[in-house]
Amino acid sequence: MNTTKFVAVLAAAALVACSDTEVGPTAPERDALAAANGPAVASASGGGRMVLEVFGFTIPQVLGFSARRHADGSASGHINYRQTFEGETFHFVATVTCMAIYDGNRVKYGGVLTRSNDPTVPVGDYMWFQSIDNGEGEGSPADVSTGSGFGSEAENEAFCASPESPDPIFLAEVIGDIQVRE
């Protein structure tokens, strides 16, 4: 990871860490979850800042996530996401319920919202993302991610289960880092 990416990841982590809301399960809760579901057979994590330019809108976002798929097929982890739209900042926290890796470097993950300050997307709804790890080092293109999708549990599970690649219009460069491991 180059120095610029490393500093950006640290800055994003500091923003998430300084949040006044919880970002996911505590270390003992994560350990208990991993023990109950078996070892992770695949994982993805990372985040950073993104700016999505879509349909004439500029939407600044901060994403941080950790997702694991376990030997029994279940998924665990957390997602912490902020987006600013037309001057209002929305913050969402979710517990990961699905995760799948495609093409070796592309991860789809989603989960149930445990925190939301957006009255149109309440706790109990689901959100999902697709992120691409484009490698490390000088000359590697930036990692990219979609903005969030929101909907029902069935839509969340269908999203993770579909190998379909993201529409490039919904991808933004991540100023940070995404790691995908199988």
What are these regions (language model features)?
Residues M1-A8:
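Bacterial N-terminal signal peptides that target proteins for export
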Residues L15-A17:
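C-terminal motif of bacterial Sec signal peptides marking the signal peptidase cleavage site
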Residues S19, T97-M99, E157-P163:
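Sequence contexts marking disulfide-bonded cysteines in secreted/extracellular proteins
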Residues S19-T26:
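Bacterial lipoprotein signal-peptidase II cleavage site
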Residues A27-S45:
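Post-signal peptide N-terminal segment of mature Sec-exported envelope proteins
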Residues M50, G56-I132:
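Predominantly extracellular/secreted and cell-surface proteins with exposed
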Residues P119-P122, W128-S152:
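Extended soluble regions of mature proteins
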Residues G139-E182:
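C-terminal partner/receptor-binding element of secreted or periplasmic proteins
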